UniProtKB/Swiss-Prot annotation:
<dbReference type="GO" id="GO:0005634">
    <property type="term" value="C:nucleus"/>
</dbReference>
<feature type="compositionally biased region" description="Acidic residues">
    <location>
        <begin position="129"/>
        <end position="138"/>
    </location>
</feature>
<keyword id="KW-0804">Transcription</keyword>
<keyword id="KW-0238">DNA-binding</keyword>
<dbReference type="GO" id="GO:0003677">
    <property type="term" value="F:DNA binding"/>
</dbReference>
<feature type="DNA-binding region" description="TF-B3">
    <location>
        <begin position="23"/>
        <end position="116"/>
    </location>
</feature>
<keyword id="KW-0805">Transcription regulation</keyword>
<keyword id="KW-0539">Nucleus</keyword>
<dbReference type="Pfam" id="PF02362">
    <property type="entry name" value="B3"/>
</dbReference>
<protein>
    <recommendedName>
        <fullName>B3 domain-containing protein REM21</fullName>
    </recommendedName>
</protein>
<feature type="compositionally biased region" description="Low complexity">
    <location>
        <begin position="142"/>
        <end position="162"/>
    </location>
</feature>
<feature type="region of interest" description="Disordered">
    <location>
        <begin position="129"/>
        <end position="169"/>
    </location>
</feature>
<dbReference type="InterPro" id="IPR015300">
    <property type="entry name" value="DNA-bd_pseudobarrel_sf"/>
</dbReference>
<dbReference type="InterPro" id="IPR003340">
    <property type="entry name" value="B3_DNA-bd"/>
</dbReference>
<dbReference type="InterPro" id="IPR050655">
    <property type="entry name" value="Plant_B3_domain"/>
</dbReference>
Length: 330
């Protein structure tokens, strides 16, 4: 239902029973009452988790995130400490509309609509350039059976090159590619906190392993996760969109166990998809094309996939974090 509030806030309480739509609300930014804190519409309170979390994560249209305090006082719930930073970084103006899509945990994807009634991208995340310092950081593919079309971009040409393997951009791969086989991988040679394999960057902040294969990566990706201790990997829009690849090396390094079906979790809700496990331990998850289409991914977007595991350490879901125009900003 829609309920207009005295502070020009409104809320749309979309049911999650179908699993297709996440709850959301919208508000109008008024500087005199929303510059340092923002009240959440009362009509939305029954959808807030209980007990009320102390903090929430706001994810902007440009891929950045803000941690804000959630407080309850005088029977109202507010975004407080940290909200002022969100306002300043996104340069919010009087009368602009903001929509908040809740993921059911603690994150809200926030969209901003300017005076022209169009969704705007603001506070774009900066993507750092990382060069490979040693020959060990170059990877080559020795067997065609290890090549996935997932690693091919839309603008690929017909020549041979080495693949740098953090999230692939459209001009980073040309034709036939080379990547190191799993048998050549030596964990003890990896110096710090992430492992990058085939078209993905793999990150686990709790380990001390890192390998840099791709020149571009999202800076500090674990900061954007629901749980910074979760394993995650980075990918992008590719020609082969019908399945999402979880590389064998990632599965081996973190002992990932996949159930026969997992859920994608994005701003539209949950989508259950079938997993296919290969002999070399790589895992493919179908219905990825639907995720790409309903989120309208472009070649300039980067996608951070957060792996969610249950108490038995079995993977049950992939949480999608979208970084709009991240590649274009480099």
């Amino acid at each position: 239902m829609w309920a207009t509030k005295s502070r020009r806030c409104a809320v749309h309480t979309s049911s999650m029973a179908s699993g297709d739509v996440l709850p959301r609300f919208f508000t109008v930014f008024l500087s005199h009452c929303s510059s340092e804190s923002m009240v959440i519409p009362r009509s939305y309170y029954n959808l807030l988790p209980r007990p009320l979390p102390k903090t929430a994560i706001l994810i902007g249209t440009g891929g950045r995130f803000w941690k804000v305090a959630m407080t309850s006082k005088q029977e109202q719930v507010y975004f407080e400490q940290g909200w002022g930073n969100f306002v300043a970084d996104n340069q919010l103006k009087e009368g602009e509309f903001l929509t908040f899509v809740f993921d059911g945990h603690k994150s809200y994807e926030v969209s901003i609509y300017g005076r022209g009634d169009c969704k705007e991208t603001r506070a774009v995340i900066q993507v750092e350039e990382i060069s490979d310092d040693t020959e060990d950081d170059n990877v080559s593919l020795h067997s065609p059976s290890n090549v996935s079309l997932d690693s091919l971009s839309n603008d690929s040409h017909h020549s041979t090159s080495n693949v740098s393997l953090r999230s692939l951009s459209n001009d980073s791969l040309h034709g036939d590619a080379e990547i190191e086989s799993d048998s050549e991988y030596s964990p003890e040679n990896l110096p710090s906190a992430s492992i990058s394999v085939e078209s993905v960057e793999v990150v686990n902040p709790t380990t001390s392993r890192q390998r840099s294969y791709k020149r571009k990566t999202i800076e500090n990706p674990h900061l954007y996760l629901d749980d910074p201790n979760n394993v995650c990997f980075e990918t992008c829009l590719k020609l082969r969109k019908f399945e999402l690849l979880v590389h064998a090396q990632l599965v081996k390094d973190y002992g990932l166990i996949f159930s026969d079906n997992v859920d994608y979790i994005d701003g539209y809700g949950k989508l259950t998809a079938k997993t296919t496990k290969w002999a070399d331990q790589r895992v493919c998850i179908n219905k990825w094309q639907k995720i790409c289409e309903r989120n309208q991914f472009t070649e300039n977007d980067s996608i951070l996939c957060e792996i969610l595991r249950n108490e038995d350490k079995v993977v049950y879901a992939i949480k999608i974090h979208i970084f709009r125009d991240a590649a274009a900003s480099t």
